């Protein structure tokens, strides 16, 4: 009986002792928490997972503590804000204790740590459960390298801007990255200007939907192998390779672009590309090609015969500054939904042959600078162009200095308000018949025909100019033009006639007898250099508001 009682007592004591011993251990385990300490004096930030938070003497943040940006975005409390960035911390340390913590997100953890140069103990960052790495190293300007070889990324879905603006990074080893679940790679390497190479051969991009600006301004990259990229689910490739000026070739033969809607600026500024094969691109869902090939200054040819542009609405600057492109056949282009053709072929300086026979321009509202400075074009047949919605033709043919033939016979200009410099420096054009132009809504005709030195025939007698305010330099240096019929011009709202006929060297007669000049303030150099004019009728001129008549008749030797 005594032995039984003794055993029972011992057992109870043993259980009690175990419970009493376990209790503080459980309390200890429960009190562990993840947090960050900033030591401003030492310029170090340390990540811990322990129960010593209260004893830390630096600035301490709980791992889930947040701050709001001006836009309302919640980011870690220790992150750099959008205005100033974090300009103190030069070193980040992951304490060994932190390896037992499993974060589910590391988004914005080091965002805008602009002077951060070292990450120590990063192997203690356990990323097994992380799903979001968005903006993790965003704007870490001074970071020269980062070892991510231990990163487990198999659960990550978001890598948006992960290394964006890490301008000092010269190399990046992502060979261990598992990206099979990633859907967002938007701006992932944006502005990584120091990277000269990037091996992404192991990347699984099957689920990626967004590749917008992925390599934006990676100016140091000289090569990029994307032959294994699966892009079947990608919808956005806008500015994907923008200003990757060091890349000389791109193999995109495996790209599936069937779901892509945005190709805006996709290759813009790729000035090193000498060739580009996009013949297999499926563009049936693309709505914007704004600046798609702009400033591809080394491209000499481009085959777009397979492009389906039926849904495209924006072709603004699509080929602008393709300064080595000699010929372009866009006969297959369907432009029925395009509304913007601003600067579409601007500064294609050696483009001698351009085929646009089937362009439907009935929805286009802007043709501003569309062919500006296309200096090699000698003829342009735009007879298919119907322009009922166009409001601006400013500088449309400006600088087309080799143009001798221009067919714009079907232009509808009823809604055009701006013809500023429309034919500026079309110095080889011998004649222009604009008798069909409806200019009722035009307010600006500044330098409209300036430097059209070869013009010998110009039909503008039907122009309705009642709303025009600026006619300065309108016929400046039309040095071969013998006469002008402006008898129908209504100038009641014109305020500026400065240099309007300056250097019309062959002009013998200009009928300005019906000009209403009561609102004109500037007549500086208006007839300067009109050396063959013998008479001018100013009987209706009202110069009460004119403040400048300097050199108005300079070198008018025959008057």
Describe each PLM feature range:
Residues 2-128, 334, 356-360, 384, ...:
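N-terminal capping/linker segments that flank leucine-rich repeat
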Residues 88-101, 115-131, 141-157, 167-183, ...:
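Structural signature of tandem-repeat unit edges
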Residues 107, 134-135, 160-161, 186-187, ...:
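Register-specific detector for alpha-helical tandem repeat solenoids, activating on a conserved position
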